[in-house]
Amino acid sequence: MMKRVLIITYYWPPSGGSGVQRWLKMSKYLPEYGWQPVIYTTENAEYPIVDPSLEKDVSSKVEVIRRPIFEPYTFYKKFLGIKKEETVKMGFIEEKEKKKSWKTDLSLWIRGNLFIPDARRWWVKPSVKYLKSYLKAHPVDAIVSTGPPHSMHLIAMKLKEELGLHWIADFRDPWTEIDYYHDLHLTRWADRKHHRLEKEVLTKADKVVTVAPDGAKRLGRIGNRNVRVVYNGFDRDDDATTTVVKPEKFTITYLGVLSKIQNPEKLWEALEEVTKENYDFANKLQINMIGQIDSSVVKVIEKRGLSLYVSYSAYIPHDQVSAVHRSSTLLLLLLMPDSEPRAKGLLTGKLFEYLASGRPILCIGPEDGDAARILNETGAGTTVSFGNKEKMKEAIKTLYNKYLEGNLPNNTSPAVEKYSRRNLAGEFAEMLNKVKS
């Protein structure tokens, strides 16, 4: 008999971006392992990215419950004079190099000190009230909360306390160790409250899961417990209708959000030098930057004289992503410098979709990090630390020569398949079975 799992998630189609992918795909494959997902999500959320193409990925076996949510962003936009159609950055954090007005600073202070743990805190009480009634009429065998936003964990924690349900807390990103946490102008009181709630979630959940080994260690230290890793992954179904266009040029592609801290300045230097040293390379070079690219990155690219090689595009629907990957010569994975505390454990969702493409990957990040280990294990690419310009040049020139020879690597290693969404859903189902027993 099919078991039922309630999944509490803020991000759900038509939301686009990385936050929606994990549980959209997990819910698609969990029924194959005997678990019917019941999604509890919002009906009127203000998502920073909207992607209607993802609606077709919602399995017919998934029950979806949508409930209204109060979003403070409407007031935030009015206060700052932001147009209604413009999106608000995660955490209300604006680019650091922009001069901030007193209104921006005040809004940031309110976000950090009154919206604890985040701006969806007002959804907790009405959600608990609704779900208590729903679950009495429609029992489930387990619940999963996924954050951020971490308010989702508070809903699940209350349900566990009041109904005694088995609960798995899924951390797609950290809480108090998230990159922008220290930009929130927190008072001592607010900082203590964030840490208290985080520890409460980590200690009260029956199981805690996250997306990378380093992140599991960090959460484990906070909660004084073992934290399980279930990676993000790729869905082979995304490739089913992919039309691959062989690139006319040596095409380097980056797809996703690129922040100031991820800006690989030595890579742009390396590319500048190779274009000056090799006229043929300069003629054949094409760089595609797709997604939300921080202005600081654009400035460095301009400074290095690379603008004529670069094409910028906004967010593209997820059903076009696979074709873009497979129509590229080289895929860029840009993490963080080794000096950043989270750098070694950063495993973005794009890594796994890059793996599925079979195209060579150049990762700029810690050479002893989690991403580097996966690239080595699968033979899918090379990792170079942020400061090693010469190694970057060597990697680019080696791949360019293979491109000229028509001998580009096309990774088909069986090791890649362990990161398929279907396999990872099986791992999560195994954990659900253990929690229930």
What do these predicted regions represent?
Residues 1-74, 207, 227, 430-437:
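N-terminal subdomain of nucleotide-sugar transferases
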Residues 72-78, 234-249:
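Acidic anion/phosphate-binding donor-loop and adjacent secondary structure
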Residues 206, 311, 325-344:
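Acidic donor-binding loop of glycosyltransferase active sites
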Residues 42-121, 125:
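A conserved catalytic-core segment of Leloir-type glycosyltransferases
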Residues 244-271, 424:
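Conserved donor-binding/catalytic core segment of Leloir-type glycosyltransferases
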Residues 214, 230-233:
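Carbohydrate-associated surface elements
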Residues 129-132, 151-154, 158-162, 175-176, ...:
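Membrane-proximal helix-turn-helix segments that form the acceptor-binding/catalytic region
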Residues 284, 289-291, 296-322:
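Nucleotide-activated donor-binding/catalytic signature segment of Leloir-type glycosyltransferases, i.e.
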